[in-house]
Amino acid sequence: METWQEVTVHVHRDAQEAVSNLLIETGSQGVAIADSADYIGQKDRFGELYPDVEQSDMIAITAYYPSSTNLADVIATINEQLAELASFGLQVGQVTVDSQELAEEDWADNWKKYYEPARITHDLTIVPSWTDYDASAGEKVIKLDPGMAFGTGTHPTTKMSLFALEQILRGGETVIDVGTGSGVLSIASSLLGAKTIYAYDLDDVAVRVAQENIDLNQGTDNIHVAAGDLLKEVSQEADVIVANILADILVLLTDDAYRLVKKEGYLILSGIISEKLDMVLEAAFSAGFFLETHMVQGEWNALVFKKTDDISGVIGG
């Protein structure tokens, strides 16, 4: 029987997606996220509320590595990369890293128990790939394999991106998804009626993961995934460009985004912590965009910009 090694990283909730991505990049075959906020107001199987759950801003992200993995090297890399994330201004909190060994069947059960179907927006529901789910009329279901990490669609930055796409897309659009990760934004764009979607990520692992998630969803042959460094080599114009990545990276793509967004098109930027908000606004305004919508969840911000000559009801430019 094959055994697995389990590494648990305790970090601030704001670092959930970034740390999940990091763990996959270091060789993890899956992650599970334990967050006390998930239990607020919920009932257990007997109908009782969870009154004794201690609420905390810290979460536990558990990663699973094959027994052949050198955990000492992995943990050293994790600590080094966490320090780098903190230097970008991401709140990681007081980090602790634990590890243990477990059997394969324990690994399979452990990470799956944390993930259930989640209604993210009015129309969009994210469902784990192994779950049979009966969608209601008009409900659009995104199948994801959370063992692949790169975000499960429940983080505030992803939720706001999905909400923006739901508000903007009416059918027939071309969408560019920058830093696609799990591919969730591209899949949502397809389900919401976009004609063609181009998904880019600098990380080869993310490109593979995105394609595997896309393949789980019917009718998503209109999504084209490729490796790419932001928008530097892209020439395809788009009606909508969406990017849910760190603010320090967002400011590097605004000029190229303006070049590629069609007139009256939109730029959706998410993943912005409040202290970096002005920096992103300035970059987008300097590129020529006008601000149409500003969304906030906790310390996270998402911005919807428009490329337009009609500046009524918009800000900046």
Curated annotation (Swiss-Prot):
GO terms for cellular component: cytoplasm. Coiled coil: none annotated. One of its GO terms (biological process) is methylation. GO terms for molecular function: protein-lysine N-methyltransferase activity. It comes from the Bacteria. This is Ribosomal protein L11 methyltransferase. Its main location: cytoplasm. Pfam families: PrmA. The keyword Ribonucleoprotein does not apply. PANTHER family: ELECTRON TRANSFER FLAVOPROTEIN BETA SUBUNIT LYSINE METHYLTRANSFERASE. S-adenosyl-L-methionine binds at T158, G179, D201, N244. InterPro entries: Ribosomal_L11_MeTrfase_PrmA (IPR050078), Ribosomal_PrmA_MeTrfase (IPR004498), SAM-dependent_MTases_sf (IPR029063). The lineage of its organism: Bacteria, Bacillati, Bacillota, Bacilli, Lactobacillales.
